[in-house]
């Protein structure tokens, strides 16, 4: 998305041979990661959620499948797995984050999540097999203050999708669903969601669907043999399936760069909340999940960050200084069950204002999942 937007902005300079754009990736394929959530409910499969990266890029972009293993910011070079070294004048770090369930004792062994394809397929098999019991949902935030977990609305979405799935299977009356939220959720305390308006709307939604909910359950450890989740607050919850939003961290190369000031070695890069430059590094920008900003680590954030960075790099080349400001804008359509959707948007100054879920909203989300996303990735929307 961003590379394509840079080509559009800098096309005259590219034609004159004054600018070249290189994209380094650790995979030849581009994955639509928000669809991993749907994999857990048998609505997406591997070939439906990926495209060859090259097919999404403008021909002017030099695309290389070569994973970055080390950043040399002082020398303005990148070292890669192949042993090559790439120089840069401007760098955009878009390495995302990775689930780290091993950071909570027992969670890797006993928990399931939907933030990677293989993990989501495993969860799908367990959800398809359960006939009775308890499905326990937990959410873990980063330890870095005021940094959200990956895709903030996803635990709510999957809870409601789970309710629909079990009803379709005819076992909902035999399976208990328990949604929990930690004591500290960015700037909020004792809540069910990290933004107050949505959190206040959730009890009514959950009660209508007979979903139990509990505030102040910060997952501390899991006993895989007894299948019990223990909270830092001293409570315990037995489960048959533990559907977790696990801890997350930056990728190894970012962790090892020494630039992050985040607590507990999480690796988030110190980001200027307006320009999206990395503090203390000349010509380096960051987009998406690796930022230390208080906004959602989700595609709806990247969609709004990309044009800001494209404008700022273009302005630095032509004018000598960045000229665009990111206002914290995020938009998405939340999946409120298997068929319903809820459009939402927010920014630094405004919280999400929940609206009634509808089938029209669900159709909009389906259209984005199945087609519009690939136009966004090409920089067309």
What residues fall within each predicted segment?
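FAD-site-proximal beta/loop scaffold in flavoenzymes
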Residues: 108-132, 226, 238-241, 245-304
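Beta1-alpha1 glycine-rich phosphate/pyrophosphate-binding loop at the start
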Residues: 1-62, 146-191
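Glycine-rich phosphate-binding loop signature in dinucleotide/nucleotide-binding domains
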Residues: 15, 83-87, 234-237
């Amino acid at each position: 998305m961003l590379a394509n937007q840079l080509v559009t902005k800098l096309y005259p300079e590219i034609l004159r041979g004054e600018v070249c754009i290189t994209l380094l990736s650790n995979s030849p394929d581009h994955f639509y990661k928000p669809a991993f959530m749907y994999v857990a409910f048998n609505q997406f499969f591997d070939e439906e959620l990926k495209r060859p990266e090259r097919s999404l890029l403008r021909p002017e972009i030099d695309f290389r499948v070569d994973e970055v293993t080390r950043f040399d910011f002082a020398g303005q070079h990148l070292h890669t797995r192949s042993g090559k070294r790439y120089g840069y004048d401007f760098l955009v770090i878009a390495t995302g984050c990775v689930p780290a369930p091993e950071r909570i004792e027992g969670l890797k062994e006993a928990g399931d999540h939907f933030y990677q394809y293989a993990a989501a397929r495993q969860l799908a098999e367990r959800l398809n097999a359960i006939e009775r019991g308890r499905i326990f949902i937990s959410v873990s935030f980063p330890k870095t203050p005021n940094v959200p977990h990956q895709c903030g609305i996803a635990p709510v979405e999957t809870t409601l999708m789970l309710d629909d799935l079990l009803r379709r299977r005819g076992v909902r009356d035999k399976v208990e669903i328990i949604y929990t939220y930690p004591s500290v959720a960015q700037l909020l305390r004792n809540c069910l969601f990290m933004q107050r308006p949505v959190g206040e709307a959730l009890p009514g939604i959950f009660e209508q669907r007979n979903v139990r909910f509990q505030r102040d359950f910060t997952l501390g450890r899991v006993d895989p043999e007894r299948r019990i989740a223990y909270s830092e607050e001293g409570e315990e919850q037995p489960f048959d399936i533990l559907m977790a939003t696990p801890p997350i961290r930056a990728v190894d190369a970012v962790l090892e760069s020494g630039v992050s000031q985040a607590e507990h070695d999480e690796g988030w890069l110190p980001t200027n909340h307006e320009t999206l430059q990395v503090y203390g590094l000349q010509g380096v920008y960051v987009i998406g999940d690796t930022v230390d900003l208080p906004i959602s680590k989700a595609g709806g954030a990247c969609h709004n960050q990309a044009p800001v960075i494209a404008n700022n790099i273009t302005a630095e080349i032509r004018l000598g200084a960045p000229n665009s400001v990111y206002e914290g804008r995020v938009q998405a359509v939340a999946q409120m069950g298997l068929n319903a959707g809820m459009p939402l948007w927010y920014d630094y100054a405004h919280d999400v204002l929940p609206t009634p879920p509808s089938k029209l909203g669900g159709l909009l989300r389906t259209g984005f999942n199945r087609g519009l996303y690939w136009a966004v990735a090409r920089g067309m929307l």
